[in-house]
Amino acid sequence: MADAHSDGRTGSTTPGKITRPETTGTKNTHSDNASTSAPGNSASASASASASASTSTLHSNSSTTTSSPQRMINHNPSTSSLRNINTGGTRIETGTGRGTGAVQNAALTGAALAFSNAMGKATPVVPNKFAGKTQLGGNGLGGKDGALAAATKVRVGGGGSPNNGGGRTRSPSKVSVTDPGMGGEQQIYGYQKVGRERTGESETDGGSVISGGLEYQGGQRIPQKRNQRPNGHLLPPFSGTSETSPNVKNNSAAFMAANLAAKRSRENSPSHTGQNYGMGMGMGKQASPLPSRRQSYASSIDSTDRRVDLSSIPPTSNLVEMWEQPDKGVKKERGLVSNRGNEIVNRQVQKRPVSSHAPIPVLKPAGLTRPVSSHASESSVQSRIASSQAPISEQVKSKPKPVIHPRPSSSQASVPGPSKPVSKPDVQPPPVSSHTTSSEAPKPSPKPPVQKPAIYNTRPASSHGPVPNLSTKPSIQKLSRPVSSHGPPPAKPSAKPSLQSIRPTSSHTLESTESSSKASVQKPSLPPPRRTPANLSVSGDQSTSLPMHAPQPRSMQSPILTTADRTEPASESPTQSPRSSSTTKTPRRSSKPTLPSRPPVSRQSYNNDADDDESSDDSFVSASSQPKPKSPSFRAKIAEQKRLQTSTYAPSMTAKTLSNAMVAGYLASSRASTPSISPGVIQPPAPPPPRRLKKFFHSEHSRTPTPPQNTLSATGVPTMKTTMRKPKTEKELKEEEGEGEKRRAKKHLVKKHPNKHDEGNRKRWRDEITEKERKRYEALWASNKGLFPYTMDPRGEIIEIEGAADTVPGMVVKDLWERSRLGGDVLEEVWELVHGKGYWGRQKQKRFGRLERDEFVVGLWLIDQRLKGRKLPARVNHSLWASAS
């Protein structure tokens, strides 16, 4: 299959190795029934945008001539587990058996030529038309038809293998372009590797930086921000130089092939060959910047895409025409209608920043965004896309000239304004290419895109995802990947703010959106942009403004999405704000794209696939000649940082893991609660002790002394001492109990009203002081007796008081009694009752204001009684004095 093809630009032939992954449709759930043969003149090139479920690799080893910088295009998705994206695309089988091998070879050659054209920067590749089946090997691929055939062939099952289970064998094998001079092979995800300029770490295709996510520079991955380019759109790759030359037609054909090959390779292979090394400076896009992630993506995408891709496959001519008609093919940013054969892959330019703020209304494009979760919708969209593609293909057929290739047009953007877009905006719902202001590619006019440069379709990179907001808001200008502006940036696109809202129009069917952005601008038919903030500001430099699709937050992504799927989440989430669709390695944010707060986590990680396409697509978007391969943008760096994080925690975001966590939490809480006491063991609380029957009329007899506090309670448990006093002896306890019994014995059988005067039962002053009380009072007396034994007689002489040693001076008594806080009148009354033995004729004057032991004890007792609430007696009984002495 080695065939030297003259480079459309340089005419030099360089052997290129084209390896195309043959996708085994093991997981390909989508079977596209539409199988048609390409026009005879195009050698029945069948661009089968069939979803390749698995990353089986068909290595079509073919030596193709790439642009003057010799590059080898390796469709090696299998090795680099690119994600196989089942996009509703038309699978077109031209011929059966090995007959398709030639077509595939031709497609590969076309892709190589397209990329080489971008590389050539001067002359777009002009694939030679191949009559009948063009084979890269013995068969020469030439002319735009050759590109078409090449694209067709690329999509045809590897080696002409029929679609898996009749489903499209979509093995968009990654095209890895190896520049021998650059060193290392470059894999091109998108059709955008045209005119790739390698500067520094990143490469610019047509002035647009294509980053597979992380570029290996010096064998080291360099996260570079990619402009999210609409994966589904076949936008004219911008060559490093203006591709305004007449080769644009060829370039469009090559473009179609390249786009097909790149996207398919990207979609089909779960991960790019991890072996890809940055060319030269490491600027070549790494086929598998994140092979592992790509593999996971591929697996998830395979399942989801295949699931979604249910629509019939439109004829290959539709795909080709879509490409050739800048109006149609171009605008589908992610959901390239013709490009992926109704692949509703819509990998929207959602760089898939995991935390993309607003989910881009990816679902809007009818199948434009292929939400991973919404398969049914995708299938319907695919069908719509297929239908739209059919007319597009017809237009393309009618137009032998490669009408301004949607992407070539942007590469050809050298023409200041998009000339009449040849392709009619057939299904141009709201022009999807609203992303780029320059996506104002000239409306596809029935006439062939004569003014190729005019048709920028500056890759309506966002055509896939964000439907162009009619507002001119330059919110997320496509990170204008400086598509190597082929010449003067398209004046019209710059002049007109692409009203296209970032949100992709309802479907890839918005091929019409691919039609000149003018059509999109003029046609406010666009569904109201769901997210205006991403509206593309029309900037003279379309390259500078690429609408960014806000990467859908992972949470929005269906748990089904694996990391690979996450590359598509924006497209999946209808509400995601479009992130700069062409977030190329060095996406230029002329107008700050409204990036979701979280930088695309895995813009490079899981956008490696989508980003490649996006970068290529978006790069084509801007015709401005700014192929600056900027160093990885800040977003790219952040994405790289978060890529690792997302790879770790993303799996936990699935519904299964969440449910498991919930159940685990519930079980843990239930098991942790009082493990020692099982529910059965828990005993009901003991019933409250029965209340004592209260007497209706409580009498004073019911009063009982405070129960004695024993050192040991009845249960033998020692009770805490409340004071420093000695515990009560048994004798004391018995005495107290006896008193209580005596009182209780006096209960009356007949209850009387408490208010009735019962003279006989009235409590009187106790007649005696208990032994306990007496001892306490005597102790206090003993400690204070004998103080101040001297006094002064009337003559002023100091004399000793008789019996002073056994008495307490009145001054000390007053001090002690006042501690009871009783009133002075009460204390005075008590003093009168006890001093000199009361009123019993004692000679108080002889006492000299001192109290003897019994007097002091009785006085303390009276004070205690008064503190207890009892009234002081009128006189102290003899019994009381007797008990005190």
UniProtKB/Swiss-Prot annotation:
Family membership: Belongs to the IRS4 family.
Biological processes, Gene Ontology terms: lipid metabolic process
UniProt biased composition (Gly residues): 156-168
Residue ranges annotated as compositionally biased, kind Polar residues, are 9-32, 69-83, 293-302, 339-348, 469-478, 534-546
Segments of skewed composition (Low complexity): 33-68, 84-95, 373-383, 414-425, 505-517, 573-585, 618-633
Q: Where is this region: Disordered?
A: 1-98, 154-246, 262-652, 671-694, 723-762
Which Gene3D superfamilies does this chain map to? EF-hand
Protein function: Positive regulator of phosphatidylinositol 4,5-bisphosphate turnover and negatively regulates signaling through the cell integrity pathway. Involved in rDNA silencing.
Q: What is this protein called?
A: Increased rDNA silencing protein 4
Keywords per UniProt: Lipid metabolism
Where do Basic residues bias regions lie? Answer: 743-755
Database matches in InterPro entries? EF-hand-dom_pair, EH_dom
Q: What are the top taxonomic ranks of the organism? A: Eukaryota, Fungi, Dikarya, Ascomycota, Pezizomycotina
- Compositional bias (Basic and acidic residues) at which positions? 325-335
Annotated ranges, domain EH:
773-879
